[in-house]
Structures are given as C-alpha cells and as structure tokens.
Amino acid sequence: MTYKVIDIEGVGEVYAEKLIAAGIKTDAELLEKCAKPAGRKALETETGISGKLILKWANHCDLYRINGVGPQFAELLEAAGVDTVKELKHRVAENLQKKLEEVNAVKNLTNRVPAVVEVQKMIDQAKELPAKMEY
C-alpha cells in the first residue's frame, strides 16, 4: 500500500508541504530518496527538516513494505526496538509479539497488537525483501 507523506506518522502539514516541494509525495518516494545517508543529508539541506526526523520517517517507510505494517504499527515496532525490515527479519515472533504487547500497554500506539502468527508472517516477509536502508 502506498501512503501520502502526510500519512506518515509525525509528518504533519508543515513538513508534508516541505517534502512535496522537494518532489516527495509518497512513502515510496521518501524511502527511495532517503535510503542512503547522502540522500537524507540532501533532503535535510533542501527542506530544513532535521536529519533525525528524516531518518525516522525513512525507517518507517522501510517497514511499510511489509504487509500489515502501516503508520501506527511502524511506530509500535520502532518503540519495541525494530526500526527496519533488516532488523525485523532477525526477530523471533513469540518474543517480538510479547514486546509489542508490553510497549503498547504503556504507550497505546495501536488498537490491537497482531497475534504471534501474524508477526511470524511479517518476519517471513522481511526475510524475503532486500535491505533498503543504509547508514
């Protein structure tokens, strides 16, 4: 699923306008431009948006490549210590699902946490996808 930049968690209208002015309208375009450090730095220079924020959004866009991961769930994954597809593929479903439950109980980021079988499907898909983010 493709998301408009305004739909990326934490972007908001002001940042969305800056990203659109820089030619980035979707999550896929943000990931493409910001997968490498040089791209993130160039976008930071062009828009004045903090490199830290750009990296966070790019990491979320990386996670959106997984079926079932959208803006809120990407936020939950990040809060549970999973920033990227590359990180997700190394996780154990039972442990990650438990951590997601614990984090969501405190931060209330999503309406529901996926069951272990759903988390396993996400991990399996992550194993099939190429790594995009570089640091």
Residue ranges and their predicted role:
Residues 1-135:
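C-terminal extensions
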